[in-house]
Amino acid sequence: MREILHIQGGQCGNQIGAKFWEVICDEHGIDHTGKYAGDSDLQLERINVYYNEASGGRFVPRAVLMDLEPGTMDSVRSGPFGQIFRPDNFVFGQSGAGNNWAKGHYTEGAELIDSVLDVVRKEAENCDCLQGFQVCHSLGGGTGSGMGTLLISKIREEYPDRMMLTFSVFPSPKVSDTVVEPYNATLSVHQLVENADECMVLDNEALYDICFRTLKLATPTFGDLNHLISATMSGVTCCLRFPGQLNSDLRKLAVNLIPFPRLHFFMVGFAPLTSRGSQQYRALTVPELTQQMWDSKNMMCAADPRHGRYLTASAMFRGKMSTKEVDEQMLNVQNKNSSYFVEWIPNNVKSSVCDIPPNGLKMASTFIGNSTSIQEMFRRVSEQFTAMFRRKAFLHWYTGEGMDEMEFTEAESNMNDLVAEYQQYQDATAEDEEEYEDEEEEMAA
């Protein structure tokens, strides 16, 4: 069966990952000891996408947990579902990366990476037909960004034909945890552009906004934010785990969403998001789901899709609904907002329908969009990067770990190229496409 191997790294990655497993266990009826306690055969039918069945009927997540310090791992282990993970799959160092990308990528992380790869290999060998990897990490710190990208590039070498999906938490515009975030993020994007197949871009500020505005939470915690992320993560793979009328998998997703290989950074959204008090006053309909799903306030990263154009998008619906209605709604969105879609990719929205809704909801939908407006985020990080790099501020922390300034310059120009590519396709029209083809050929030559 099409298994997915889940990897989480660093503090942020481990906290998101822990929440994700709570959601997945809940959907498949697995209790915190790993025993099945559900009531529907459908929960077990394709449970092996994310779980390995061990002796005594226990289900063990196909998860690898890594960090350069033991703290977060301990809290995952003592958390509600901490006991279902395989103890050997916790790989951690003692020193920490101290928010330093170079430590995670070159020094501390490099020492630990082989033991992580051993665990990954062992898990991959347990798979019948491994479909790919999903990695949770943040790009602002040291471990998730530095060691996370190191692991991604190593896995790329060893499993070149498997899908590599990342859930990457970008530094947010107004909320900054560390001063050197722009450095860490730029160096990471440099890696992700080359080595990942699909990146779901998340950021804390957008998630906070959703919690404040839509969910009406007075004081959102990281737990609330991570819950939003895990709902989306579960939606991305629901087609693999439950039967549906229109299925999609990681590869179909990539084929439908990525028109040019470098442009694989997606915005994600989830619907229905309603505040706890007002849930019972809303009837869920496909039009309503669609409307909320495309709403810019619903996007989990701080870029406004109205400032750019969608190259492609994908909508995954869950629950009992008519596919005809889904198709009509999707067409409707495209016709009414045609200026926000590039016209040189006709029918650029893919939809899929899965019959089983998430627990507690009649129907739900997950949105993944490849929009040129995501350049706003890269541009913002790039400006912060340039401001510090021009003065060579904080560089000694990185050069001290053996990095070269050259690497910073390369990462910076790669990020700026990415922004320029998004801009180019945002401005492109169907008529002047021929010119681009000539340019592409020249570039290729």
Swiss-Prot record:
The keyword Cell division does not apply. Its cofactor is Mg(2+). GO terms for cellular component: cytoplasm; microtubule. It holds the Pfam family Tubulin. GO terms for molecular function: GTP binding; GTPase activity; metal ion binding; structural constituent of cytoskeleton. One of its GO terms (biological process) is microtubule-based process. Keywords: Cytoplasm, Cytoskeleton, GTP-binding, Magnesium, Metal-binding, Microtubule, Nucleotide-binding. Residues 426-445 are annotated as: Disordered. The keyword Magnesium applies. Its main location: cytoplasm. Tubulin is the major constituent of microtubules, a cylinder consisting of laterally associated linear protofilaments composed of alpha- and beta-tubulin heterodimers. Microtubules grow by the addition of GTP-tubulin dimers to the microtubule end, where a stabilizing cap forms. Below the cap, tubulin dimers are in GDP-bound state, owing to GTPase activity of alpha-tubulin. Dimer of alpha and beta chains. A typical microtubule is a hollow water-filled tube with an outer diameter of 25 nm and an inner diameter of 15 nM. Alpha-beta heterodimers associate head-to-tail to form protofilaments running lengthwise along the microtubule wall with the beta-tubulin subunit facing the microtubule plus end conferring a structural polarity. Microtubules usually have 13 protofilaments but different protofilament numbers can be found in some organisms and specialized cells. This is Tubulin beta-1 chain. The gene is TUBB1.
